Amino acid sequence: MTTGFSVAVAGASGYAGGEILRLLLAHPAYTAGRLRIGVLTAGSNAGSSLIEHHPNLTPLADHKLQPTDSTLLRGHDVVFLALPHGSSAKIAEELGPQTLIIDCGADFRLTDAAAWERYYGSKHAGSWPYGLPELPGGRDALHGTKRVAVPGCYPTAALLALSPAVTAGLVEPSVTVVAVSGTTGAGRAPKAELLASEVMGSARAYNIAGAHRHTPEIAQGLKHPSGGPVSVSFTPVLIPMPRGILATCTAPTTASLSEIRDAYEDAYRTEEFIHVLPEGHLPTTKAVVGSNAVHIGLAVDPDAGVLVAVAAIDNLVKGTAGAAIQSMNLALGWPEADGLSIVGVAP
């Protein structure tokens, strides 16, 4: 087991960076004095105090935000990158191979260079082990790694909702995902469409019909036994709440609900963070807020011949920062659940 190490967070003034720090402060390695929180960086917020942006992080009140520069990040054992998409590749290249780098952006998620260039409009930087250990083979790829690509928040919910059925061949390789998300999923940069007066009392679909950048990531993570690609229709919807994603996923099936439930229970039996709810129960976002938990409800529509799988996550925890901490634990050989809760904050 690795002991005595320092952690840096680039992009610490944003929602993801702040949530990483919140989870680190509760991590057993930090409370035991084996984890030291080092340099914290920001872009336009460099020079300000962390506490100005995250007043909940009072143990770190004396930390000033530094400019995001690889020279300041060097020398840390672990570096979390919570930066805008396209910003991580250059910094990662400048850090040494012995640094554990955990990227919360999209730079290294996609394996298909053409898909990256289509959706992100820049040169593909490559791919890293994907930080979703609950997928088939995912955990093995993270043990001892020095590089992690944290999944997107929507793909996390959709993949965990669908993977057991798709992998077992219980559904056709064509899925539909309609997912509602809170406003923190759009980041902290000021945008007119995220003003309270625009969001409150309204719901808005956006980047529909294959336009959302998470569409190829969902397709990439689904493995059908036919060996062919899985087509994905993805519709994201912004709703007026700060945290949470509820993904309602459907796929054609001739299987019974009993067969499908057996596949999910087999896939997730030993997964601490995933809870397949009892038959007839459906997840709610408020039950998982603040936790790394995933709640999944299952049903089969016999008239339409489709599986309906519904997953709820906290987009800032299991959808970002929690996955980053979980991946760090695996990479360092620590207990996977260290610093992470399965208990949400309710009401």
From Swiss-Prot:
GO terms for molecular function: N-acetyl-gamma-glutamyl-phosphate reductase activity; NAD binding; NADP+ binding. GO terms for cellular component: cytoplasm. InterPro entries: AGPR_AS, AGPR_type-1, NAD(P)-bd_dom_sf, NAGSA_dehydrogenase, Semialdehyde_DH_NAD-bd. It is found in: Cytoplasm. Its main location: cytoplasm. Pathway: Amino-acid biosynthesis; L-arginine biosynthesis; N(2)-acetyl-L-ornithine from L-glutamate: step 3/4. Catalyzes the NADPH-dependent reduction of N-acetyl-5-glutamyl phosphate to yield N-acetyl-L-glutamate 5-semialdehyde. Belongs to the NAGSA dehydrogenase family. Type 1 subfamily. NCBIfam families: argC (TIGR01850). This is N-acetyl-gamma-glutamyl-phosphate reductase. The gene is argC.
